[in-house]
Amino acid sequence: MESYEQEILKKLKSGISVIGISKPEEYIPAIPNFIKAFVPQAEEGSPRALVLCLTDDDAKSIHEVLEKATKEIDLTIDLVFNKGSKLKQRNDLFDGTEVIVGTTKRICELYFQNGFNVGKLKLFIVLQMDEQISKGMKGFIARLAESLPKCRQLIFTQHPKEERFVDYIQQFVSPSATVEVK
């Protein structure tokens, strides 16, 4: 039997977007492997993965996990969050990065105000999608998703059966498969 992580990777590599149903403590340890699968080495220039988090603290903890896990392949992982200096964060992104981790609102603001290039994006991850929707991030996520090139999308949620959630996800994640922790 395949593990939750292996099942998600298999579907993503086949070009299908994935809705992962699990708690953060179940998927956070797997995020570095998802990133490494699509951003295997450092390159100059544009981001190749975006990770959208609900809160500043979530973004900081995911950033820390990714920094440790990708140290050996020397990926540049930039952290952008609401309480940080927008000017410093913008300058960091202009210097080039492989992965951007941050709050949904700040990533969206920086993207639309400063236009970092998403042309090479390979992986778009939204964490705690159900909570992000209930906290008013729906519009930010939709605007980012509409701007993306064809890339793999990975959405994590705990409550996938809510009708408003299902309808919203189908707007921009297609085709998709659902993978649940057993």
Say what each PLM segment does:
Residues V118-K182:
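Post-DEXD/H (motif II) to motif III coupling segment of the RecA-like Helicase ATP-binding lobe
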Residues E26, T55-A59, G84-K86, R106-C108, ...:
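Conserved nucleotide-binding/hydrolysis micro-motifs of P-loop NTPases
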Residues S17-I21, I31-I62, D74-L75, L148-R152:
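Conserved SF1/SF2 helicase motif Ia
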Residues Y4, Y27-F38, G139:
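Motif I (Walker A/P-loop) of helicase-class P-loop NTPases
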Residues E44-G102, R106, L121:
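Conserved nucleic-acid-binding Ia/Ib motif block in the N-terminal RecA-like helicase ATPase lobe
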Residues K10-K13, P40-G45, A69-I73, N91-D95, ...:
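Conserved catalytic network of the ASCE P-loop NTPase/AAA+ motor domain
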Residues I21, V51-L54, V80-F81, V101, ...:
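Conserved beta-strand segments of the P-loop GTPase G domain that flank and frequently precede/overlap
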Residues M1-E26:
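Conserved pre-motif I regulatory segment
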